[in-house]
């Protein structure tokens, strides 16, 4: 069985602030940890799909300076990802998913299109990168699609109709969230709200730039043991 694992990488800005750095310096360090996470996932044959929450719709309200630095970081890191031999050798399909793409610069949108096109026929593993996304909008977009509006008028809308129109089709099995908190909390922040209805959840109580491979191993052991106890 192959699992779908999600990552909510929280704490880049707080990590930077605590060190007297600019917010984007935290994002740069976080980018290194995304690369570590992807390498870790690729070492697990039972992980078939990965979804990473990089930028929510709400994040578009951040300063123009911070967003500009973020867009440049995405451009550099995604171009590097696209040239990785492992992506093509392992036939990993890359989906860049947005529920609001209007604020995204044109050059970045073109890069997204090239990545989708270049990997669209790959079917061994899937990597979903959520940029300008929120689960509430994804569900509303699905309900209000022309086909679903027609079905709702004529027959009534079913869950299968809604799921078929979602941008991420596969149920999420396990969500890892990072972020230093005074007490553990389960907060999805709009991440795959429909798809994660039955997902297991694990909180790493560290800012994302501080996480290690061992943290991911501990999280994965928790997930596998929990699933084993449930007989799944």
What are these regions (language model features)?
Residues 1-232:
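Flexible, compositionally biased loop and terminal segments
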């Amino acid at each position: 069985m192959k699992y779908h694992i999600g990552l909510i990488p929280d704490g880049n800005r707080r990590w930077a602030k605590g060190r007297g750095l600019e917010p984007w310096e935290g994002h740069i360090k976080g980018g290194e940890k995304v690369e570590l996470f992807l390498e870790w996932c690729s070492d697990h044959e039972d992980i078939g799909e990965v979804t990473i929450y990089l930028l929510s719709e709400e994040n578009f309200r951040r300063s123009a300076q911070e967003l500009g630095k973020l867009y440049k970081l995405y451009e550099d890191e995604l171009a590097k990802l696209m040239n990785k031999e492992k992506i093509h050798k392992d036939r990993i399909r890359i989906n860049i998913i947005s529920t609001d793409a209007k604020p995204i610069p044109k050059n970045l949108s073109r890069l997204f299109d090239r990545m989708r096109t270049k990997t669209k026929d790959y079917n061994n593993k899937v990597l979903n990168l959520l940029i300008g996304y929120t689960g509430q909008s994804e569900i509303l977009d699905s309900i209000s699609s022309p086909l679903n509006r027609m079905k709702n008028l004529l027959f009534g809308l079913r869950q299968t109709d809604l799921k078929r129109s979602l941008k991420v089709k596969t149920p999420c099995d396990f969500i890892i969230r990072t972020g230093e908190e005074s007490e553990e909390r389960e907060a999805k922040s709009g991440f795959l709200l429909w798809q994660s209805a039955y997902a297991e959840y694990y909180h790493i109580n560290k800012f994302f730039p501080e996480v290690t491979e061992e943290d991911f191993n501990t999280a994965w052991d928790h997930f596998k043991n929990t699933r084993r106890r449930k007989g799944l």
